Amino acid sequence: LMGGERQQQCGELIYDLNDRRFSLRGEVLTLPSREHAVLENLIARPGRLMSKEQLAGKVFGLDQDASPEAIEIYISRLRRKLDGSGVRIVTFRGLGYLLEAEA
């Protein structure tokens, strides 16, 4: 990462790369491992689209459970947790998702 940058940020959501922890508005946001993996992939590329298949590949690796439908479930759970924070996951039908901070 450029300039020893050890955190990624999207609005009030911050991801500390050293201890692999999210915080939202200064509060630690604890997530189940697969939700964490989804959000970790989205915050690495704020504003850039990731397809369901890309996310499934990253989240599940070679795991047989890998299903794009499961990604939808994690996205909806994450949306609930981010609700009202000014950070949101936007769906582009048939294309994928991106993370953005509301202006």
Feature annotation, model-predicted:
Residues 1-11:
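Basic, amphipathic DNA-recognition helix from helix-turn-helix-like DNA-binding domains
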Residues 3-5, 83-86:
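Short glycine/proline-enriched coil/turn segments at helix->beta-strand junctions
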Residues 9-11, 18, 25:
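Short strand-coil-strand connectors
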Residues 12-14, 88:
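Short, surface-exposed charged micro-motifs
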Residues 14-15, 29:
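Short, isolated positions in well-ordered beta-strands
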Residues 21, 26-85, 91, 95:
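Positively charged, aromatic-enriched patches within helix-turn-helix-type DNA-binding elements
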Residues 98-103:
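C-terminal edge and immediately downstream basic/flexible tail or linker adjoining helix-turn-helix-like DNA-binding
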